[in-house]
Every structure is written in structure tokens, then in C-alpha cells.
Amino acid sequence: MNAIISPDYYYVLTVAGQSNAMAYGEGLPLPDREDAPHPRIKQLARFAHTHPGGPPCHFNDIIPLTHCPHDVQDMQGYHHPLATNHQTQYGTVGQALHIARKLLPFIPDNAGILIVPCCRGGSAFTAGSEGTYSERHGASHDACRWGTDTPLYQDLVSRTRAALAKNPQNKFLGACWMQGEFDLMTSDYASHPQHFNHMVEAFRRDLKQYHSQLNNITDAPWFCGDTTWYWKENFPHSYEAIYGNYQNNVLANIIFVDFQQQGERGLTNAPDEDPDDLSTGYYGSAYRSPENWTTALRSSHFSTAARRGIISDRFVEAILQFWRER
């Protein structure tokens, strides 16, 4: 492990969207193995403590990134039934840490990765409560509406700005976005592309003052991840409208990130798709019950193994390809 504890500057990556963008992997966290923190990987704080039982922190402090980031929705209490230490194996598992770990070999040794977590499970453009926003705490826990002036949007912009303002040397890599599932189910799904495009345009305008920290490109990249097979099979028309917009967007630098071939299954929290791996001490989602699972619809979310593997792999490939071409 690299001995540097405090990087001189950070590559900033904002992670936003709904549940599949965040820690909804239901398998057992392995904080001493696959999910180990790294001294050069940090996040912007949101909660009162860095982790359950950990030291206190304040909103937008730079703190270590773990497997369960400080998103708008707090997943730190959704413990796996076989977790033996709720101060280390707490909550659920996301992909942000694994994206950051896989980016480290491609950045200078004196730099780090700073993740800006801004996700909310169940959030949408066409449904959901707006919640509230405050400069001291960001978006409220019940904020579930995306747009150009909603609390979730204010949270997204203000925290990204805060990360860049920490150090003028910090560089913005872009936004990793996974969202659309909740809108798939609404009657207004066809308006999602317009709402999303307007939000991206607003975000880019609101980051103009940090132009030099975006390598002087005008349009900050958005890396838009795909969803699970469940949504594709059950909502094919609305899927084509929403995710088709990610794939063929009229705006510049909207990059679609896919994880599976058409018609392929697997990669979800469904117990038969998330097996144990006793060689690593990993126990999958089958042990969870209504008291501690994220939802009864298990195939609606990507698994812990998928987040550690193909999801973070594909995001990193897309990020590296984008910036190499510049």
C-alpha cells in the first residue's frame, strides 16, 4: 500500500442518482479484504461520524471513503445478518470505493481520489417528495426529486463545488450517474430525457467558475450506468426512452456505461445470483430477510459482487477512455 496519507491534491468524482448508484449491494462487507479503505481515497462527509462508532466529522469534511458512503440516504444501519462487527462490517456495499481503487494506478502517487456522494434511493425526476436543503446539512433524508432547482440538485452542485474549492489543484473527473428506475414506472417517463438533459446543462453552467479544474473543457462528462435485467424485461418501452437517451444523447460528453449483453441475466441481489464465496469469507444476499434487506424486489439492484467487479470495472474503463482522448 502506498505510504502517502495526505495527498497533495485530489481527482474529484461525483457519484449521484438513485439506489443502484449507491450502497445497495446486500452481500457481506469485507473491510479487511476486498472492501478495505485506502489512505489516498477519501469522500466528502455528510453524517455526524465518519462511520458507526467512529470519530465525529462535519458536513463536507474530507474523510476516509468506505464501502458504505455518506449519501443522502444513510445505508449504514442495513447490516448483513452474518456481520460480526457493526463498526467495520456495517451496512451495505457500493461501487464508489472500487471505482476509486481501480483509478489509483493511473494518477500520480502524490494525488488521491475524492468521492462526492450524492445518491438517494428511490429518487426520480417525475415522482417523489422534494424534501429540503440547507447549507449546513445538504439535502434532507426525504429528498427524492431530481431537477434543476430541487434539494437533491442543490446538494449535487454545492458538494461538487465544495470538493473543488478545497484546493485549486483538485481536478474534476466527472459524474458517475445511475438513475431512471423509479421514472420507468411512472406515466410521465417520456419526459425524463428532457429533465435529465436540462439538469446536466444547469450543472455544467453552475461549475463554470471551476473551468480550469475541468482541464478547460466546457462540458463536464457524465458517465451514465445501465440498470439490472429486471427493469429492462419488465419496462421495455420506458427503458428505451430513458436509457436510450443516455446511449444517444444530443449533449456532448454523455457516456453510457453498460454491464451486460441484451437479454443477459445475473449480477443482482437475487439470492441465486449472489452466491457465497467461502474462499474469501463472503456471504451473499440469501441470509437477508424483510428486517434487513433493501427491498423485497431483489433483482432490482446490483449485487455486492457486481459492484466490486463489472460495475466498477466498466466505469473506470469509460473514465480512462474519456480523459485519454483529451
From Swiss-Prot:
Q: Where does the signal peptide begin and end?
A: 1-21
Q: Where are the transmembrane segments?
A: none
Q: Name one GO molecular function term.
A: sialate O-acetylesterase activity
Q: Which GO terms describe its biological process?
A: carboxylic acid metabolic process; N-acetylneuraminate metabolic process
Name the UniProt key words of this record, in alphabetical order: Carbohydrate metabolism, Hydrolase, Periplasm, Signal
List the Pfam families hit by this protein, alphabetically: SASA
Q: Where in the cell is it found?
A: Periplasm
Q: Name one GO cellular component term.
A: periplasmic space
Chief location of this protein within or outside the cell: periplasm
What is the documented disruption phenotype for this protein? Cells lacking this gene cannot grow on Neu5,9Ac2 as the sole carbon source, in contrast to wild-type, but grow as well as wild-type on glycerol or on N-acetylneuraminate (Neu5Ac).
Describe what upregulates or represses it. Answer: Induced by N-acetylneuraminate and modulated by N-acetylglucosamine, via the NanR and NagC regulators.
Q: Does the keyword Nuclease apply?
A: no
EC no.?
Answer: 3.1.1.-
- Note whether Signal occurs among the keywords: yes
Q: What class of enzyme is it?
A: hydrolase
Report the protein's function.
Probably catalyzes the hydrolysis of the 9-O-acetyl group of 9-O-acetyl-N-acetylneuraminate (Neu5,9Ac2). Is required for growth of E.coli on Neu5,9Ac2, an alternative sialic acid commonly found in mammalian host mucosal sites, in particular in the human intestine.
Stated name of the protein: Probable 9-O-acetyl-N-acetylneuraminic acid deacetylase
Organism (species): Escherichia coli (strain K12)
